[in-house]
Design a protein with these regions (language model features):
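Hydrophobic alpha-helical bundle cores within soluble ligand-binding/oligomerization subdomains
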Residues: 2-163
Length: 163
């Protein structure tokens, strides 16, 4: 496929067709409150990125508030306990080639996880939070397991005490 270059002086037009149109209402995220900013549950993302750990922001998004020290310690312990991935997920990941894109690997892992650990019929808030926590905890495990298997032929233990 040949690359095309724009004519000299060509400037792409900024689409304004949906400017000012709400794409959806959510308590999780606000975009463009005062320009090109991003807020998670009212907190500026730049402030969070500079002062918070991953698990603190995850807790904010999933549970609605920043955790105190005790809550953060408990949340980290919970996520550690959820790192494991079922044998069926490992088997599916072992079939993926080393050339697979990491996003495709995670999508496949989540699809298999959803089949072997189906959601309950009632989607109450605590149940939905548990699902979000399980996904957050296991996505890294899926990616690491696949990478070590596909690139080194080695199955690794993903249930560790490592931070």
């Amino acid at each position: 496929m040949s690359e095309t270059t724009p004519a000299p002086g060509f400037k792409p037009k900024k689409s304004v067709a949906l400017s000012g149109t709400a794409a959806g209402n959510t308590a999780l995220c606000t975009v463009g409150r005062s320009g090109n900013d991003l807020h998670y549950r009212g907190y500026d993302i730049l402030d969070l990125a500079n002062t918070s750990e991953f698990e603190e922001i995850a807790h904010l998004l999933v549970h609605g508030k920043l955790p105190n020290k005790a809550e953060l310690a408990g949340y980290k312990a919970k996520l550690k306990s959820l790192r494991g991935i079922p044998a069926a997920v490992k088997a599916a990941l072992e079939e993926l080639p080393p050339s697979a894109h990491p996003m495709d690997v995670m999508r496949t892992g989540v699809s298999v996880l959803g089949c072997v650990s189906p959601e309950k019929d009632d989607h109450n808030h605590p149940g939905a939070r548990d699902i979000a926590d399980k996904l957050m905890a296991s996505l890294g495990s899926m990616l690491l397991y696949w990478y070590h298997w596909s690139h080194n032929g080695r199955a690794i233990d993903v249930e560790t005490d490592d931070d």
